């Protein structure tokens, strides 16, 4: 049959596009995503993401909890890099309270935020490789992620849902042995990253599956509300750590990698380079924590906001009362509204917090970067082949905890 005959047949009455379900049980669907794809042969005509399968009512639940009890809910949003979400909520509450975190507390926060970034990017680039047919990278990536999760566990007692950040600082100081082990890991990791790059970066098949796939121009990225790697891949050096520095990021030396084509391959390359920059930041944090001015408390020493030390509690009745009040009633945040955002691994993670002067948030609106990225699936995938859908989805880096909340 000639092409002319085939086109005539396609235009004939009675022919229609083919509709298929992608997920929620699909191995490349990254959790509970369901896409309804409308296909013309192998070409994608329309993508309809169905979300809500992991909806837990997080924003409403937070309204019923004290500020301290709200922190663990943030671990369960982007559960690949939990501490980064806690960071945004704590920054919002600290802005309303008008407090500044002690320097050592800031350094620990930055250190663990960068560990979270590597955790997220490692999972993303290795599973993106798996989506396009490479089986080895995930095995190597999970080996490194296991070591990082051990650092999470040694700091907070939990591998994933850490609940380590506190309003005013962090839960507790890091032991010197842990800081030393993180330092040793930072020295060894770039070599592991080189091994991953040898497998993927110049791999002919990997490039064929990613180059010129899912192209997003910079104007389109701004129009769709993209942030993070999705914007940097299109050529804008927009990073909240540099544009609106929080904690001690203004002291850190690091580069912001940007792409020029805005395709899946550029986004992969940026994530690899961001992991190298995260290691640089972690090394600087460790050096600053070991310096004399990096010593001191890790949480603000105000018993109206943070609990007293256990030793003090056993000696002072007043300290015991403070402890009891903080854990039963919680801290009262002055009335006001504030927006605080951090550069999470997936983009700008923001918290819009409204306080009414009580011990519970009046409203906590969560701005998840993955939500804006997922809604553009239809626009990005249109005209691509069915096989490209999983490559595009992988490069968007969607985690459903934060999309559905």
Curated annotation (Swiss-Prot):
Keywords, sorted A to Z: Cell inner membrane, Cell membrane, Membrane, NAD, Quinone, Translocase, Transport, Ubiquinone
Gene Ontology cellular-component annotations: plasma membrane
SS bond list: none
Entry's transmembrane regions: none
Listed SUPFAM superfamilies: HydB/Nqo4-like
Reactions catalysed, as given in the entry: a quinone + NADH + 5 H(+)(in) = a quinol + NAD(+) + 4 H(+)(out)
EC id: 7.1.1.-
Any one GO MF annotation of this record: quinone binding
Pfam family, any one: Complex1_49kDa
Classification via InterPro entries: NADH_Q_OxRdtase_suD, NADH_UbQ_OxRdtase_49kDa_CS, NDH1_su_D/H, NiFe-Hase_large
Localisation: Cell inner membrane
Membrane topology: Peripheral membrane protein
PANTHER family per UniProt: NADH DEHYDROGENASE [UBIQUINONE] IRON-SULFUR PROTEIN 2, MITOCHONDRIAL, NADH-UBIQUINONE OXIDOREDUCTASE 49 KDA SUBUNIT
Subunit details: NDH-1 is composed of 14 different subunits. Subunits NuoB, C, D, E, F, and G constitute the peripheral sector of the complex.
Function: NDH-1 shuttles electrons from NADH, via FMN and iron-sulfur (Fe-S) centers, to quinones in the respiratory chain. The immediate electron acceptor for the enzyme in this species is believed to be ubiquinone. Couples the redox reaction to proton translocation (for every two electrons transferred, four hydrogen ions are translocated across the cytoplasmic membrane), and thus conserves the redox energy in a proton gradient.
Family: Belongs to the complex I 49 kDa subunit family.
Protein name, entry field: NADH-quinone oxidoreductase subunit D
Gene coding for it: nuoD
């Amino acid at each position: 049959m000639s092409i002319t005959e085939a086109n005539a047949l396609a235009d004939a009455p009675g022919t229609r596009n083919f509709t298929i379900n992608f997920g929620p049980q699909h191995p490349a669907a990254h959790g509970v995503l369901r896409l309804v794809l409308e296909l013309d042969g192998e070409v994608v005509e329309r993508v309809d993401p169905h979300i809500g399968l992991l909806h837990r009512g997080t924003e409403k639940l937070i309204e019923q909890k004290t500020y301290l009890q709200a922190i663990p809910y943030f671990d369960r949003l982007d559960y690949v890099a939990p501490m980064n979400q806690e960071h945004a909520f704590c920054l919002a509450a600290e802005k309303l309270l008008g407090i500044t975190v002690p320097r050592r507390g800031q350094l620990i926060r930055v250190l663990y935020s960068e560990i979270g970034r590597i955790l997220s990017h490692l999972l993303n680039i290795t599973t993106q490789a798996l989506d396009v047919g490479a089986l080895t990278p995930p095995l190597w990536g999970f080996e490194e992620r296991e070591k990082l999760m051990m650092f999470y566990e040694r700091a907070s007692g939990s591998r994933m849902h850490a609940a380590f950040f506190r309003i005013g600082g962090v839960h507790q100081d890091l032991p010197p042995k842990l800081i030393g082990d993180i330092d040793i890991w930072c020295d060894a990791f770039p070599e592991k990253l080189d091994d991953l790059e040898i497998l993927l970066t110049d791999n002919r098949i990997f490039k064929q599956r990613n180059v010129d796939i899912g192209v997003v121009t910079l104007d389109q990225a701004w129009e769709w509300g993209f942030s993070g790697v999705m914007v940097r891949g299109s050529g804008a050096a927009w990073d909240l750590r540099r544009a609106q520095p929080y904690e001690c990021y203004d002291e850190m030396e690091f580069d912001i990698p940007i792409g020029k084509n805005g395709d899946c391959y550029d986004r992969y390359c940026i994530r690899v380079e961001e992991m190298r920059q995260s290691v640089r930041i972690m090394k600087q944090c460790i050096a600053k924590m070991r310096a004399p001015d990096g010593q001191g408390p890790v949480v603000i020493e105000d018993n109206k906001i943070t609990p007293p030390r256990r030793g003090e509690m056993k000696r002072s009745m007043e300290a015991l009362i403070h402890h009891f009040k903080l854990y039963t009633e919680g801290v009262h945040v002055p009335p006001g509204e504030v927006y605080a955002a951090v550069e999470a691994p997936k983009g700008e993670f923001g918290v819009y917090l409204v306080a009414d002067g009580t011990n519970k948030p009046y409203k906590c609106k969560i701005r998840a970067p993955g939500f804006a990225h997922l809604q553009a699936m239809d626009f990005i995938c249109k005209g691509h082949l069915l096989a490209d859908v999983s490559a595009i989805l992988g490069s968007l880096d969607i985690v459903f905890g934060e999309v559905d909340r």
